[in-house]
Design a protein with these regions (language model features):
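Active-site neighborhoods and metal-handling regions in enzymes and metal-associated proteins
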Residues: 1-281
């Protein structure tokens, strides 16, 4: 395995983050968003269900701090060296008397940030209130600064390398919708159609494999069409039913979404009027 992009691309991203940190007068930044860790270093593992962060400094490569059993994925998917991999012990997981963020805080202390301004992501999944509280109480000697979405803004404008990966994701998304079109029919169960969709999304296209998309396949059929994000069921599609499918493709963690509406037979005039209006733009 190797990182999804070459080192120069990751260096470009790190330079952007450090520039934004300087603009906000930050000496360091603690990242809790798995997507931001992935964008910055390539780190890719299903490890975000336990406490983990990435520390960004001005004079040191990014530092990953997480569960010991997940440290191997850092070497497999990033350019980081052993000096930048700081795991905590397995016996700290799911304990009431101690929290992994305390060990992470002790490790961060080694970078001599006392009295320094340290940013953190305040509104992100998988970086819980307790995790933030334990980290900040452990490192009470630093000045904490809300730096939410700092990395996200750096991600906004895509590089040429990123656009190429997104094009592959879009091709996968287009193929996924084509597969859905070929298999959707009255009598087919929603779950069986989704099985075809997931197979197509994972197999990818033209030799490029697919990843798990950020959004699972959404099937809006029958009563479920009255809401925005219903999960699929084992209910068969019906004749003359209007069905909306919100699908997508993913490649190297880059996503492309594509929504389509199908009419399984005859539909009310309002459906055709809406389709004509959409076609006209």
């Amino acid at each position: 395995m190797k990182p999804a992009f070459d080192l120069s691309e990751y260096q470009r991203r790190l330079d952007l983050v450090r520039k934004s940190m300087s603009e906000q007068d930050l000496d360091a930044l603690v990242i809790g968003d798995p997507a931001n860790m992935n964008w910055l270093t390539g780190f890719d593992a299903w490890s975000f269900y336990v406490p983990q962060v990435m520390l960004v400094l001005h004079d040191h490569a990014p530092v990953w701090l997480g569960r010991q059993m997940d440290a191997g994925a850092v070497y497999l998917t990033t350019y980081l060296s052993e000096e930048s991999v700081r795991p905590y012990s397995e016996d700290l997981v799911q304990r009431d008397d101690v929290h992994p963020m305390e060990a992470i805080g002790d490790e961060i202390r080694k970078f001599d940030l006392s009295g320094k301004r340290v940013g953190f992501e305040s509104d992100t999944y998988f970086f819980s209130f307790k995790a933030v509280e334990r980290l900040q109480s452990t490192l009470s000697e630093v000045h904490w600064q809300d730096a939410d979405r700092l990395v996200n803004w750096c991600r906004l404008i895509k590089s040429d390398a990123e656009v190429e990966v997104m094009r592959v994701a879009a091709q996968i998304a287009s193929n996924v919708q084509q597969v859905a079109r070929e298999h959707i029919a009255p009598g087919v169960r929603q779950c069986d159609l989704v099985a075809k969709i997931l197979e197509a999304g994972t197999s990818g296209i033209n030799g490029s494999g697919g990843d798990l998309p950020a959004l699972c396949p959404l099937v809006m059929a029958g009563e479920a069409a009255a809401t925005a994000h219903p999960m699929w069921t084992d209910i068969p599609f019906e004749k003359n039913q209007t069905v909306a499918l919100e699908l997508g493709g993913a490649h190297k963690r880059y996503n492309a979404g594509l929504a389509r509406t199908f009419q399984l037979g005859s539909g009310p005039q309002k459906v055709y009027d809406t389709a004509n209006a959409v076609t006209e733009g």
